[in-house]
């Protein structure tokens, strides 16, 4: 009996040891990584989809039936080819070919380059799409007729015919930091979220593509360490008020070998955030936007195969939208026939769905109300339904809906209270629903078009069970008032036993950038467990969505226009004062932490709110909007020449004299997004004002500051800072 008790005690001690929630467990193991359904690819007939699975150490692309949730066969297995590692794949419409990307190498946030191989499902041969000695390719994509693949290499556009694998070079003038064909420049990739710059026509006989002339864009240099002599990485980065790339749109005819330019007009200081082919034969739609990003025109050009040499293309304006502030670029445009398109707009004060007849300009609003449509998934011609995601129940949640374009009747297709995302079959008879909430990881279900659950694909039962061992607290969703009496959405995480005598330190987590929320009823990954670990140390953790954040209508989101940082800072200060008045919060020990825009916010709060905040952590912060890229900055601030006063008034570098508390500044030296320059200029001002602070740089790390033991080191450093300044 005694030995048995000793054994039980030993087991309990072991369990206790391994159930200690700490940074090592969070950041250097895969203990808390949720399972997911990987590589979902709806197949052409609408009855099947493919998914990526790891089985017995090999990667497999599996074909599934939606109706039966049954494996129908393995389309491709890496074990047949020496377990070749691939990171992405595409299946041709006829399922004859599979395109896989290997040895993928990141370039910037969205972009990468790979060696691409194409697999013939009939003869089971795997071939490189091009001579690998010429370098890696980018953005490879099948033509709609399944006979060709287009791609970019070294800033030039190419395609191959799959019948003979002959490579055809479309452009020849591509040059790094000078001319880009078929891809986008840095600022388009970052701020318009596109890196692909070519698009097949519906018939597969033409390719429309971007041409970026970067020659007049100023160059930014980053030092890269790790060698005896540091090297310089150079790329074109247009900062606020500076020159952009000159943009051209060309259409290449594969049969005539001719390239025809799309006339964008005389004004070259414009943006072209999207191009796409309509359902009309040979009609290209170009989205043209002015530099202030408050006027958007949709232009049409027809490119007929039999067009005589040197004949220009007639350009027609199909649609125009303007704003007194700015317009968001979205991917909700769907051409449903030769005359009508689905469109979303904030023109009535909230983001809603419209049907636009682009022949005569007539429009019909399909959804309305004091809520925002967040994404449009597609249009089902058979039942006249548009499928979409919306923050209809709350700005903190997302649901899946359908709406009939004739009756305007809306049906709810999801049932989980939290965040729902959908991947629809090509015939819209089925969709895979990805659901999570603030305290539970992803739950995948296969549903029919009415939302009825047909099958459960992944429930993350193992992770949920594991989480029970750590006695985690719940995120509580609340509202807090700002100085003007506006109720702001927030969440709070509190220790199970609150100490109203000694009280608790508070850490506020902030982002606060335009349209971006941190108060979401969804799974938030590893930061969720880090916050939980702080709660176990006695911290209260909270986050507040200030003015300027999303899904509360245009007025709320656009209230920070021309004055970034002003109202957001006031709201965070108001929230800190509110929390400080709670009987379990030590108002002398309030800290704030943010990354990127959040680092900008935490830097403003510790200076402008010096009497409220005791400590602040700023990771990779913008410290002066003059240092940031022009598309983002000018969208919300206009140019420094037009709005210089507000650039300066709300820049942290101009408020360091107010600093009283503890300030930790962290940045990666190879941050291509928010340049290391921002932190160095902040350091200069802090030194000039004789302010004590902590500063740490991660050599050769980008905006994400990760790789190897980097994240563990970073979070250990932040833990030590918080414990030293908020707990002692």
Where are these regions (language model features)?
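Serine-hydrolase catalytic core recognition
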Residues: 219, 273-276, 281, 287, ...
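Short loop/turn segments that connect beta-strands within beta-propeller blades
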Residues: 66-68, 120-124, 162-165, 253-257, ...
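Predominantly five- to eight-bladed beta-propeller fold
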Residues: 29, 69-72, 103-108, 112-115, ...
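Beta-strand C-termini and the immediately following turn/loop, strongest in propeller blades
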Residues: 50-56, 65, 90-91, 99-110, ...
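Signature of short aromatic-glycine-proline-rich micro-motifs recurring in repeat-based ectodomains
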Residues: 34-40, 84-90, 183-203, 274-275, ...
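Non-catalytic accessory segments flanking enzyme active sites
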Residues: 34-41, 47-61, 73-75, 87-90, ...
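Blade-loop segments of beta-propeller domains
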Residues: 69-96, 100, 105, 133-136, ...
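Beta-propeller domains
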Residues: 211-363
């Amino acid at each position: 009996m005694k030995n048995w008790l000793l054994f039980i005690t030993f087991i309990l001690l072991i369990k206790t040891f391994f159930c200690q929630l700490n940074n090592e467990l969070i950041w250097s193991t895969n203990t808390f990584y949720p399972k997911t359904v990987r590589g979902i690819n709806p197949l052409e007939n609408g009855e099947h989809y493919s998914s990526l699975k790891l089985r017995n150490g090999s990667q497999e692309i599996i074909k599934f039936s939606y109706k039966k949730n049954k494996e129908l066969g393995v389309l491709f297995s890496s074990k047949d080819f020496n377990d070749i590692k691939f990171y992405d794949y595409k299946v041709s419409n006829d399922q004859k070919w599979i395109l896989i990307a290997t040895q993928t190498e990141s370039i910037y946030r969205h972009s990468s380059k790979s060696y691409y191989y194409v697999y013939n499902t009939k003869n089971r041969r795997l071939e490189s799409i091009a001579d690998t000695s010429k370098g890696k390719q980018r953005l490879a994509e099948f033509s709609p007729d399944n006979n060709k693949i287009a791609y970019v290499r070294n800033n030039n556009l190419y395609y191959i015919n799959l019948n003979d694998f002959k490579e055809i070079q479309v452009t020849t003038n591509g040059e790094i930091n000078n001319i880009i064909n078929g891809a986008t420049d840095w600022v388009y990739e970052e701020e318009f979220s596109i890196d692909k710059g070519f698009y097949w026509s519906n018939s597969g006989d033409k390719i429309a593509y971007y041409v970026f002339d970067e020659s007049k864009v100023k160059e930014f240099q980053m030092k890269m360490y790790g060698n005896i002599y540091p090297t310089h990485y150079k790329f074109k980065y247009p900062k606020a008020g500076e020159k952009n790339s000159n943009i051209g749109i060309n259409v290449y005819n594969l049969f005539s070998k001719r390239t025809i330019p799309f006339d964008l007009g005389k004004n070259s200081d414009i943006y072209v955030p999207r191009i796409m082919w309509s359902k009309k034969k040979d009609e290209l739609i170009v989205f043209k936007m002015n530099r202030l990003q408050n006027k958007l025109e949709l232009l049409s050009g027809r490119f007929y195969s039999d067009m005589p040499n040197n004949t220009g293309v007639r350009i027609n304006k199909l649609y125009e939208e303007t704003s007194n502030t700015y317009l968001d670029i979205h991917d909700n445009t769907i051409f449903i026939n030769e005359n009508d398109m689905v469109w979303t707009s904030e023109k009535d004060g909230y983001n809603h769905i419209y049907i636009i007849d682009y022949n005569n300009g007539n429009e019909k609003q399909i959804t309305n109300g004091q809520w925002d449509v967040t994404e449009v998934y597609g249009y089902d011609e058979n039942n006249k339904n548009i499928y979409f995601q919306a923050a209809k129940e709350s700005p903190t949640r997302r649901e899946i809906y359908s709406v009939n374009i004739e009756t305007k009747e809306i049906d709810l297709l999801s049932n989980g209270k939290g965040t729902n995302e959908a991947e629809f079959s090509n015939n819209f008879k089925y969709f895979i629903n990805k659901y999570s909430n603030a305290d539970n990881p992803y739950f995948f279900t296969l549903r029919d078009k009415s939302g009825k659950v047909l099958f459960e694909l992944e429930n993350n039962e193992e992770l949920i069970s594991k989480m029970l061992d750590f006695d985690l607290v719940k995120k509580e969703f609340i509202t807090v008032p700002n100085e003007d009496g506006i109720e702001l959405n927030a969440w709070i995480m509190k220790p199970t036993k609150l100490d109203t005598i000694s009280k608790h330190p508070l850490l506020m987590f902030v982002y606060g950038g335009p349209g971006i929320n941190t108060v979401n009823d969804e799974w938030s990954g590893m930061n969720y467990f880090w916050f939980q670990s702080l709660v176990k140390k006695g911290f209260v953790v909270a986050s507040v969505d200030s003015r300027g954040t999303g899904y509360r209508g245009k007025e709320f989101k656009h209230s920070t226009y021309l004055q970034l940082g002003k109202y957001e800072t006031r709201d965070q200060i108001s929230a800190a004062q509110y929390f400080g008045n709670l009987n379990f919060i030590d108002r002398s020990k309030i800290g704030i932490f943010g990354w990127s825009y959040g680092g900008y916010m935490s830097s403003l709060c510790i200076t402008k709110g010096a009497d409220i905040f005791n400590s602040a952590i700023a990771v990779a912060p913008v410290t002066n909007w003059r240092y940031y890229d022009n598309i983002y900055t000018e969208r919300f601030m206009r140019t420094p020449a037009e709005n210089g006063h507000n650039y300066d008034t709300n820049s942290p570098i101009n408020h360091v004299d107010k600093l009283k508390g503890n300030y930790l500044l962290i940045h990666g030296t190879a941050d291509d997004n928010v340049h290391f320059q921002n932190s160095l200029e902040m350091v200069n001002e802090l030194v000039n004002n004789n302010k004590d602070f902590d500063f740490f740089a991660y050599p050769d790390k980008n905006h994400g500051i990760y790789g190897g033991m980097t994240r563990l080191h970073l979070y250990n450093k932040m833990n030590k800072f918080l414990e030293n300044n908020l707990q002692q």
